[in-house]
């Protein structure tokens, strides 16, 4: 949305986000996006690799993949609202993965239906989801506390004679 179409914006006022310029905040955002993408990729590999054995879990896993990709998009655009939801979903997925991982190793014996990928590999990938989700929770909550949404209003130096000083505080 342009500032011309928003009636609450004053002429000559520039909105800045000072916390977004800090290297630690940019690194946190990049880490959250990477962890969301890695999580989606791991769930995708486990879903495709065990497609014929997962039965009822397929819609849930596809849902996780889609939601994590959407959240990665929004986190890359500095939307911190997805961070606590990402953390909650990561806790749930981490619990599911911790419970499901050993069962893939149990299927590595004769008499069980074969998955597309080796059951041992699927077990390893499923258990690998757990530390990735722990990291995602940690970095998502860290990013949420960094104040990505903090805005400062300042006068545009070219628009007024006050030299770009801060505009009077307005509720956001």
Language-model segments: what does each one mean?
Residues 51-55, 76, 80, 102-109, ...:
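Transmembrane helix-loop junctions in multipass membrane proteins, especially transporters and channels
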Residues 72-101:
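Loop-to-transmembrane helix junctions at the membrane interface
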Residues 1-39, 135, 139-147, 156-172:
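Cytosolic juxtamembrane helix and N-cap/initiation of the first transmembrane helix
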């Amino acid at each position: 949305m342009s500032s011309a179409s928003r009636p609450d914006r004053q002429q000559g006022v520039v909105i800045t986000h000072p916390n977004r310029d800090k290297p630690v905040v940019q690194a946190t955002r990049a880490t959250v996006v990477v962890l969301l993408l890695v999580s989606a990729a791991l769930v995708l590999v486990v879903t495709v690799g065990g497609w014929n054995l997962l039965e009822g879990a397929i819609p849930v896993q596809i849902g996780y993949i889609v939601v994590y990709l959407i959240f990665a998009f929004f986190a890359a655009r500095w939307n911190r609202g997805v961070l606590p939801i990402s953390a909650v979903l990561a806790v749930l997925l981490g619990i599911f993965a911790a419970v499901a991982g050993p069962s893939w190793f149990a299927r590595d014996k004769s008499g069980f239906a074969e998955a597309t990928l080796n059951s041992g590999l699927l077990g390893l990938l499923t258990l690998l989801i757990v530390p990735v989700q722990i990291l995602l929770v940690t970095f998502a909550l860290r990013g949420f506390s960094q104040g990505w949404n903090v805005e400062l209003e300042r006068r545009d130096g070219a628009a007024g004679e006050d030299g770009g000083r801060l505009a009077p505080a307005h509720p956001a």
